[in-house]
């Protein structure tokens, strides 16, 4: 494994999001099971940390942009800065939704439709952001997730306010449609991995990449679908599981997503105004890391080089010895005997 290349492709933004979601889901499961008695404002602490990092990073990036006009003429700089502003706007709407959720749980004084109102605004904004991202070749996973779930948000709000009395299995129909699409993606990667394994014209690196993608998608989608099914059955009263066993598949998916961030290129360079890859930024701040991080080992290659460089000792040379009777020649390699060729009699013509 090439650790240097692995960290060069590290995406710190996604890692922060998945880590905060993992910690939040652990605290939420413990709170729902009554193991901890914290306030929900404390349970949402990882979410507040996530949004705080977004706001601070965008503020610093905007300050660097304003103080350095020369940066605006650099290639994709304007596109990346606009993408950061779009992401900040969506995160602020999500922050408003999360604050309303905590207030509704703690005090219970207003309708869930009002709580979900920021999400109803997020969806059309996310659709516009996706159109802009496709035109400028930008990857916008969060925006796509918010845009395709507008119907799911409406159903959940209506069900929580008891305006509709459908079972949760029916309420989550838009979610099942989305998960069916993800299952097709998993099947697609599995089929292509099998085809690449059976093909002799594909190099080993491509086979390894497709197998890794297939395993990653399986480890993400299958546990996530399991979590959703268990949660819906619990809400409908079909099982009496505690929340921790239900959340375990979700934790597995989030851990896998965290692992995949080490092989994903991308990330906006304008967060905190660093304007470069995160690992390169760290190496410039902490130069001593270069001594330990910029080293690669190849034991097999080193062994082969040592074998090539080490001269092979030659066997001692022994003078040839001839014996007339046996007509045996002892060559320079002791112990190896070669019979001489038979005599040829060439008769000269008269």
Curated annotation (Swiss-Prot):
Protein name: Transmembrane protein 185A
One Pfam family linked to the record: Tmemb_185A
Gene Ontology cellular component list: dendrite; membrane
Subcellular location: Cell projection, Dendrite; Membrane
Tissues in which the protein is found: Broadly expressed in brain where it is specifically expressed by neurons (at protein level). Also detected in some cells of arterioles, intestine, lung and testis (at protein level).
Mediates interaction with MAP1B: annotated segments: 298-350
Record membrane topology: Multi-pass membrane protein
């Amino acid at each position: 494994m090439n650790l240097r290349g692995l960290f060069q492709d590290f995406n710190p933004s996604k890692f922060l999001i998945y880590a905060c979601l993992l910690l939040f889901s652990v605290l939420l499961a413990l709170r729902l099971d009554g193991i901890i008695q914290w306030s929900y404002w404390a349970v949402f602490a990882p979410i507040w940390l996530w949004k705080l990092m977004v706001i601070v990073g965008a503020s610093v990036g905007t300050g660097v942009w304003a103080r350095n006009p020369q940066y605006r003429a650099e290639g994709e700089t304007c596109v990346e800065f606009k993408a950061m502003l779009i992401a900040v706007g969506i995160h602020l709407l999500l922050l408003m939704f999360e604050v309303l959720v905590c207030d509704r749980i703690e005090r219970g004084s207003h309708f869930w439709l009002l709580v979900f109102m920021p999400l109803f605004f997020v969806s059309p904004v996310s659709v516009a952001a996706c159109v802009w991202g496709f035109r400028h070749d930008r990857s916008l996973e969060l925006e796509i997730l918010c845009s395709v779930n507008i119907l799911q948000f409406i159903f959940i709000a209506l069900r929580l306010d008891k305006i509709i009395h459908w079972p949760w299995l029916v309420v989550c129909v838009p979610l099942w449609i989305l998960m069916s699409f993800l299952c097709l993606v998993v099947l697609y990667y599995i089929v292509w991995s099998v085809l690449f394994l059976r093909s002799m014209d594909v190099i080993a690196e491509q086979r390894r990449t497709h197998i890794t993608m297939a395993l990653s998608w399986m480890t993400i989608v299958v546990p996530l679908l399991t979590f959703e099914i268990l949660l819906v059955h619990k809400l409908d009263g079909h099982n009496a599981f505690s929340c921790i066993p239900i959340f375990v598949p979700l934790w597995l998916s989030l851990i896998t997503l965290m692992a995949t961030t080490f092989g994903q290129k991308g990330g906006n360079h304008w967060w905190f105004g660093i304007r470069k890859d995160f690992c390169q930024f760290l190496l410039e701040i902490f130069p001593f890391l270069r001594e330990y991080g910029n080293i690669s080992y190849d034991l097999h290659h080193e062994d082969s080089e040592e074998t090539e460089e080490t001269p092979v000792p030659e066997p001692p040379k022994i003078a040839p010895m001839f014996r007339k009777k046996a007509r045996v020649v002892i060559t320079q390699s002791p112990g190896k005997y070669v019979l001489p060729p038979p005599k040829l009699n060439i008769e000269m013509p008269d």
